[in-house]
Amino acid sequence: MSIAVFPGSFDPLTNGHLDIIKRASGIFEKVIVGVGNNTSKAALFTPQEKMTLISTVVKDLPNVEVAIMKGLTVQFMNEVGAKYIVRGLRNGKDFEYERDIAGMNSALADVETVLLLAKPKNQNISSSMVKEIGSMGADNMVKFVPKAIVEALKERLNAQKK
């Protein structure tokens, strides 16, 4: 069985992330969205909250699972029997970063990195940008994040203002 892991901090999951998940689910027999924690960024949602939100969004994709990922991606992949890492590329800067990480991952384990190009409408979306414009009161967040996440995002950002 071809199993892929799509790792990320997903704080929050964006429409760009969701597009990569959907496309990967058409390529691999099973896709596991690995919810990690980026220690260099202040998280808006806990890993458990992110897992719950993402699970709601992908519920109609039968070969997609969501799990909390601790430690190195390659360690998690070994635990779940995955051989492929899926990553999305928005631009050349992403490519440089992902190329370096792919090299490190393949040095650590027998894994392949599969890079999917972001569709033009998603090339400028990042979780950091979504949080920034959301904190400034943008009301059309559904352009950037799945509808099921918009309310949770607005609530959390409003709670931070208090």
Swiss-Prot record:
Protein name: Phosphopantetheine adenylyltransferase
Binding-site residues, ATP: S9, F10, H17, G88, L89, R90, E98, N122, Q123, N124, I125, S126, S127, S128
Keywords, comma-separated and alphabetical: ATP-binding, Coenzyme A biosynthesis, Cytoplasm, Magnesium, Nucleotide-binding, Nucleotidyltransferase, Transferase
CDD domains, sorted: PPAT
HAMAP family named in the record: PPAT_bact (MF_00151)
Subunit structure: Homohexamer.
GO cellular component labels: cytoplasm
A Pfam family hit: CTP_transf_like
UniProt site (Transition state stabilizer): H17
List of residues binding substrate: S9, K41, T73, R87
Biological-process GO terms, alphabetical: coenzyme A biosynthetic process
Transmembrane segments: none
One example GO MF annotation: pantetheine-phosphate adenylyltransferase activity
Subcellular location: Cytoplasm
Pathway stated in the Swiss-Prot or TrEMBL entry: Cofactor biosynthesis; coenzyme A biosynthesis; CoA from (R)-pantothenate: step 4/5
Entry annotated with the keyword Transferase: yes
Family the UniProt entry places it in: Belongs to the bacterial CoaD family.
